[in-house]
Structures are given as structure tokens and as C-alpha cells.
Amino acid sequence: GINKQNNVNGNVEYIALQFPIHKRLAMSVGLLPYSYVGYSFGAQRTNEANLNYVETYNGSGGLNDLYVGLSIDVWKKRLSVGANFGYFFGNIKHEQYSIVGTGNTYNANRSQNLEVRDLKMDFGVQYTHPISKTEEVTLGLTFSPKKRLHSTYTNTSVKYTDNGASEVISSDTLKNQAYDIPNSFGFGASYVKKDKLTLAADVLYETWGKAHFYSSDNNFKNRVRVAAGGEFIPNAQNRNFFSRVRYRAGAHYSNSYLMINN
């Protein structure tokens, strides 16, 4: 008997629009990815009956943030504050397959599906200080408060026989389950010399160590992400193509919020 299963997944990278609605008020709307799951690995094992089988683990899906943002110029186009009002949605699926390579045994599939639908908010403040007519420095702070998202969690186990029949061993659907996204604190700074040089860096700190995921309270640790980048234009006014090319480089580092037991 041959068992075959196909999965097709799609994902939108991002959509974002910004536009002024008043001389001191601007709006932004967009669809941004918040998290992404994508993995596949397996191993050959031996069960209690001394039969060899292949165990495969797959993960797919992600969470997206559909948001509307507002920002207000508080002081002389230098100091501004803003907030995003977002709708969180998405599905995350984890699957485990056990495939036995004999004609009188069965294959098994266990899947866990998380479906999230909820609201969230983010806040920010930004200050720009001009150094000269062509240079400025910008500093920014962001804060996203901890949010307990309401979600639906489905855990299903299915057995497949060689003749193509399937039997649901167990299926549990838990609605209005608790799934946390943590407090998030961000700081960024940039230096811009008009038509010449841009340097920027930011730091993000997330308190995953206090996050809750259903019955698990101790599987996460706090996460730090550091990123830096720059852009250089040799001569923006020169007619030579390579003099007007924007040369960019960047790097980032982050630790995982997952706590792996040794």
C-alpha cells in the first residue's frame, strides 16, 4: 500500500501604505507578518515490536497583523507620537507522521492546529534633531503591551491503513484558549546625511519568559534582537550610474525565545 499526502500553503509577505490626512496628522494601514513557522525534519526509529518506522515532523503557517496607525506631530515636525490598532489573525499547524514500511501495519498522523483571532495595540514616540541643513539624528521608542490572545486549539490523531481507510483516534477542539504575546520594548537610532549616508540601528526586547501557552508556562525565555544597517551613495548628482547607485549593508542577531531542555 502507498499513502500519499500533499499540503499547499501560501503567505503574504507584507503590505503597507502611509499618507497624510492633516498637516500634523498622518495615517498608515498595512498587513504585516508577526511570526512564521516553517520546518520539516525526520528520523528513522524502531518500535516495541522491533519494526522500523520513519517519524516526520512538519510545521507551517504564521500570524499576521492587519493594522491602522495614527501619528501626530507634537512639536515643530521634530517630536511625534503614534499608535497602531491591529487585528491579529492566522493559523499555525504542527504535524507528526509515523510511517511503517510493511504491508500489515498502519501509518499515523497527529496534528495540532492553532487558530488566532484577536485585537492588539502598539505605541511609539520619535524625536528628530537637525545637526545641519543636510544632517539629522532620529531617536525612537516603541512599546507593545502584553496581550492574551483568544484562540482555538485543535488536537487530532488519525490512523491510516494500507487499504486507504482512515480512523480518527482522538480529536479535541478547545475554544477561547489563552495564548500570550509578550511585552515588547524597542529602541532605535539613525543618522542621515541627505543624498549621501544613512546609518541606523535598533534593539528589541521581548519578555517571553512570562508568556503563557495553554498549559505550558516555563518553555520560553526572554528574547533580544539587535540590528544595524547603512546606505551609502557615492555622488547622487553625478550622471555616472555607479556613482548614483545606493550601496546597502546590514546585519542582525537574535536569540530564540524557545527554551530547549538539555
Predicted features, each with a name:
Residues G1-N262:
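Subset of outer-membrane beta-barrel
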